C-alpha cells in the first residue's frame, strides 16, 4: 500500500505516434535530446526527479539565505548527524560537487582508487585528479540471472590483487557505493561494509561511502541479512555509515530533493582542507553550492528517507515494475535493484550485435511505443567496455503510480513481440569527449 497521496499534480500527455516518430528523429535517436514535454513516463533517472513532501515544501520558507553561518546550515548539519552520525558536513550543489571536493583532497596523480563499481561521475573525478579508478565487483555481479542477495558487494580479493600489483602506498582511497548503481542497483551487505572498512584500514586508505542510495541499501540489509530483520532502516543505515571515514552524498536521490548534496568527514584536518576546496568550487562552507531554502528541504528529506513507510514503499514499487516486466516475458537483470529495473536488451534484441547498440535501440523503441524514456547503459554509454547491454528504467521517488508502471511494462512487452523487426543504430555525430558521448551524440537507424 502506498504511504502517501498527491497534493499537487503535473499534467503529462502522450504525444501521437506520428509525433513520437518525429521527436525521435529530431533527437538523433538519443533520449537525452528529447524535450521532456514529449515524454509520457520519464524513467531516465531517479536523480532529482522525485516528489517532495508537504513538510519539505513548508521547510523551504524557513530558508536562511545568509552568506555565512546560515541557520539552515545548522539544521542540515543536525539532520546529517542524526541520520548518518557525521558531524563535519559541507553542503554541495549535488553529488559530483561532493566528489570534486573530497577526491580533490585525497587523490593525486598516479594514485589508484578502488570501488565496488565507480559511477560515471566518480570515475571522471578520480581520472580528473590523475588517478586510476579500478572496479572490484564480486563474482557474478555481471551475471543478469544469478540470484544472490548482495551482488553489489566489494571484492576484497580482487582489491588485494590490485594492491599486490601497484603497492598499498599508491591506493589512498577505497570507495563503497551503496547501493551499487553501476551494478544494476544491487545492494551491499552490512558484513561487506565491515570487511571493506577493514581492508581499507589494512592498507591505510581513507574509506569513503557513496551514500546517495543509503536507505534503499539499509532496507535490503533488513530484508536479506541475518540478524538485521528486527532492526530499523534508520539504525542499519547509521551502522553502515559508522564504518566510513567520509561520505559523499547526492541529495537528489535519498535526501529526496531536486538539487543538492553534501560531503561529510570524520577527520578534523581533512575537514579543513575540504572546506578550502569547497570555497573554491562550491561556495562558503555553510551554504556550499545551495540556497538556504534548498538546504532546508534537504534536511527534512534526509530524515524522511529513513522513516519506515517511505523506503519500504519505494523499493517495493521498483520490484513491482520488475514483476510486471517478467510477467510479460521481458528479460531483466535479477534480482531487481533498489532504484531501477535494468532490462537486458542484449537478450531481448539478441539479433543486434553490440556495434548496433541493442540497448539504445530498445530505448528508442520504448519511446516510440509508449512515450517512455529510459537510459542505455551498454556499448553506447561505455564504448570499448565489455558490459551487459542494459537499459535502466529508474523510478523517481513518490512520483508515479501503478498505472504508469503498467503502461511501461505494456510498452516493453509490445517491443518484445516485434523484437526481430527492431533495427540497430549507428553513431552519426559525437562530441570530442568519448566518455560523455551518450549525453549528446546523434544516431541513425542502420
Ligand atoms: N554517485 C552515484 C552512485 C550516482 O548514482 C550519482 C548520480 C552520483 C554519484 C552523482 O550525483 O548527479 O547529484 O552529481 N547518479 C544519477 C543517475 C545522475 O542517473 O544515476 P549527482
Question: Language-model features: where?
Answer:
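Conserved PLP-enzyme active-site core in the AAT-like
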Residues: 2-29, 33, 42-50, 56, ...
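Short beta-strand-to-loop capping motifs
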Residues: 265, 343-346, 395-397
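A short, surface-exposed helix-loop junction/capping segment
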Residues: 54-61, 345
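C-terminal, active-site-flanking charged/polar segments
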Residues: 16, 361-366, 413-415
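Conserved phosphate/anionic-ligand binding catalytic regions in large, soluble enzymes, centered on
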Residues: 252-255, 341, 400
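Conserved small-domain helix->loop->beta segment predominantly found in fold-type I
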Residues: 286-360, 368-390, 423-432
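Short, conserved charged micro-motifs
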Residues: 179, 272, 350-358, 398-407
Amino acid at each position: 500500500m502506498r504511504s502517501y497521496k498527491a497534493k499537487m499534480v503535473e499534467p503529462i500527455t502522450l504525444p501521437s505516434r506520428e509525433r513520437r516518430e518525429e521527436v525521435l528523429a529530431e533527437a538523433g535517436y538519443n533520449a537525452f535530446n528529447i524535450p521532456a514535454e514529449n515524454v509520457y513516463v520519464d524513467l531516465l533517472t531517479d536523480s532529482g526527479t522525485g516528489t517532495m513532501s508537504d513538510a519539505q515544501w513548508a521547510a523551504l520558507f524557513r530558508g536562511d539565505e545568509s552568506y555565512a553561518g546560515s541557520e539552515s546550515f545548522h539544521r542540515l548539519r543536525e539532520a546529517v548527524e542524526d541520520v548518518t552520525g557525521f558531524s563535519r558536513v559541507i553542503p554541495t550543489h549535488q553529488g559530483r560537487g561532493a566528489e570534486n571536493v573530497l577526491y580533490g583532497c585525497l587523490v593525486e596523480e598516479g594514485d589508484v582508487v578502488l570501488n565496488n563499481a565507480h559511477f560515471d561521475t566518480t570515475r571522471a573525478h578520480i581520472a580528473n585528479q590523475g588517478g586510476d579508478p579500478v572496479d572490484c565487483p564480486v563474482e557474478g555481479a555481471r551475471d543478469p540471472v544469478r540470484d544472490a542477495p548482495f551482488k553489489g558487494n566489494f571484492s576484497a580479493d580482487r582489491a588485494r590483487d590490485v594492491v599486490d600489483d601497484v603497492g598499498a602506498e599508491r591506493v589512498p582511497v577505497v570507495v563503497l557505493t551503496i547501493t551499487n548503481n553501476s551494478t544494476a542497483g544491487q545492494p551491499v551487505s552490512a558484513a561487506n561494509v565491515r570487511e571493506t572498512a577493514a581492508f581499507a584500514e589494512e592498507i591505510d586508505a581513507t574509506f569513503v561511502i557513496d551514500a546517495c542510495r543509503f536507505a534503499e541499501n539499509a532496507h535490503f540489509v533488513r530484508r536479506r541479512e541475518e540478524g538485521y530483520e528486527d532492526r530499523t532502516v534508520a539504525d542499519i543505515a547509521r551502522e553502515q555509515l559508522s564504518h566510513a571515514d567520509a561520505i559523499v552524498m547526492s541529495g537528489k536521490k535519498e535526501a529526496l530533493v531536486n538539487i543538492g548534496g553534501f560531503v561529510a568527514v570524520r577527520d578534523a584536518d581533512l575537514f579543513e582542507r575540504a572546506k578550502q576546496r569547497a570555497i573554491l568550487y562550491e561556495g562558503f562552507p555553510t551554504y556550499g553550492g545551495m540556497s538556504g531554502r534548498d538546504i532546508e528541504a534537504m534536511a527534512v528529506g534526509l530524515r524522511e528517507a529513513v522513516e519506515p513507510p517511505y523506503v519500504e514503499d519505494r523499493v517495493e514499487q521498483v520490484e513491482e515494475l520488475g514483476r510486471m516486466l517478467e510477467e510479460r516475458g521481458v528479460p531483466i537483470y535479477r534480482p531487481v535493484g533498489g532504484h531501477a529495473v535494468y532490462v537486458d536488451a542484449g537478450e531481448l534484441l539478441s539479433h543486434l550485435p553490440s556495434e548496433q547498440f541493442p540497448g539504445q535501440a530498445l530505448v528508442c523503441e520504448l519511446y516510440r511505443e509508449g512515450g517512455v524514456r529510459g537510459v542505455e547503459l551498454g556499448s553506447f554509454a561505455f564504448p570499448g567496455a565489455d558490459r551487459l547491454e542494459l537499459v535502466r528504467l529508474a523510478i523517481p521517488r513518490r512520483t508515479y503510480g501503478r498505472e504508469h508502471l503498467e503502461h511501461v511494462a505494456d510498452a516493453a512487452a509490445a517491443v518484445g513481440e516485434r523484437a526481430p523487426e527492431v533495427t540497430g543504430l549507428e553513431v552519426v555525430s559525437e562530441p570530442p569527449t568519448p566518455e560523455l558521448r551518450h549525453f549528446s551524440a546523434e544516431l541513425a537507424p542502420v
